[in-house]
Amino acid sequence: MKKMTNLRCIAAQTIEKVVEQGQSLSNVLPAAQKSVGDKDAALLQELCYGVLRTLPQLEWVIGRLMSRPMTGKQRAVHFLIMVGLYQLMFTRIPAHAALAETVEGAVALKRPQLKGLINGVLRQFQRQQDELMQQMNDGDQQYLHPKWLLERLKRAWPAQWKQIVDANNQRPPMWLRVNRQHHSRDAWLTLLEESGKQAFAHPQHGDALRLESPCAVGQLPGFDQGWITVQDVSAQGCVALLAPRDGEQILDLCAAPGGKTTHILEAAPQAKVMAVDVDAQRLARVSENLQRLTMQAEVKQGDGRTPAAWCGDTQFDRILLDAPCSATGVIRRHPDIKWLRRDRDIAELAALQQQILDAVWPHLKPGGTLLYATCSVLPEENHVQIGQFLQRHADATLIETGDLTQPGIQVFPQADGGDGFYYAKLVKQ
């Protein structure tokens, strides 16, 4: 059945849910995509991701074109104008089509009386486009990050903050992990090339391939059979550092959606793995991934701060703690993070990470390894967190594998490389 709803209206409503209501894009977008049908789902995704990526510039332009912002019940129209501006500024959609469809979105929003206003604002932009596009690259809005985060990055990484911000504003590459139980990386790459696609092997990570162009997983040879998993190369680095072995008791804590759980079992098929996450909905995806790769693990819902509740007095040979964090290293994949996070969240997240680390440490066997990981680039969650942990726990030793000036390894997001990530490998004496 043909869907009749205005796509620009749906994009505006989806963006409003993220920016005004604090919902995550990955939670609200799938339902929105179902309402427009397969053909338009990709365009809806492009508009939502694009507006959230470039929000400060769009806000700045609206501020130049309108004397006062739209508030209250008119707020959705504000986001509809943003959708219109994004199309005119950053896409190849013909201007006449972008304009007509966006103006018509006012009817779908039950604000037909504002069609003239929307049309006027977008046409005014067209008249001043060159001048506005030049001016919007002068102030802080050019960096496309909230002020608080920009200040934290400048303070933490005075030499690298621009590189981090630039990478955050790019479209992310699509990384794959080849399941070595089925194929070597080179053998699967041959299958991919036979299907007409290209990928590039990572020089350090033996299972990792970067697709030349992202595609739907259904187009990847053997995806449903578990030959391949979509996982960023930085996340793949966790299991290489954890170094699991057959026969070991291994805990994957904060395991959802299961990419690292399955990677552990690819590396050590005879390991006894327990995968734990606090979020029941996301935990279901761990089970789905295990099923797709025909692997076995004990999957449990549980809070990392109270391990005795879900593992009793069990001690593990290895623990992978992919801690809850600000996700500031994966902004390019989830641009809504910039608008969902607040400055005060960082201290709260650091406190939560500390509680989980301290709670789970007694469940590591003497001689065992705990790998602490985050997808953050903020020191409070990373080397500062681990520095404080080492001061509290005399029986913990950090295995130095990176820059010796600070504990652990900090990776920044890179255009053709991995996401921003942090790792610290701790051994119990």
From Swiss-Prot:
Gene Ontology annotations of biological process type: regulation of DNA-templated transcription; rRNA base methylation
CDD domains linked to this entry: AdoMet_MTases, Methyltransferase_Sun
Record-level GO cellular component terms: cytosol
Amino acids binding S-adenosyl-L-methionine: 254-260, 277, 303, 322
This enzyme's EC code(s): 2.1.1.176
Molecular function terms from GO: RNA binding; rRNA (cytosine-C5-)-methyltransferase activity
UniProt keyword S-adenosyl-L-methionine, yes or no: yes
Subcellular location: Cytoplasm
Highest taxon, organism lineage: Bacteria
Family matches, as Pfam families: Methyltr_RsmB-F, NusB, RsmF-B_ferredox
Residues forming coiled coils: none
Main location: cytoplasm
Keyword Ribosomal protein attributed: no
Reactions the enzyme catalyzes: cytidine(967) in 16S rRNA + S-adenosyl-L-methionine = 5-methylcytidine(967) in 16S rRNA + S-adenosyl-L-homocysteine + H(+)
Active-site residues, as the UniProt record annotates them: 375
Keywords: Cytoplasm, Methyltransferase, RNA-binding, rRNA processing, S-adenosyl-L-methionine, Transferase
Function: Specifically methylates the cytosine at position 967 (m5C967) of 16S rRNA.
Family statement: Belongs to the class I-like SAM-binding methyltransferase superfamily. RsmB/NOP family.
Protein name, per record: Ribosomal RNA small subunit methyltransferase B
Source organism (scientific name): Erwinia tasmaniensis (strain DSM 17950 / CFBP 7177 / CIP 109463 / NCPPB 4357 / Et1/99)
Higher taxonomy: Bacteria, Pseudomonadati, Pseudomonadota, Gammaproteobacteria, Enterobacterales
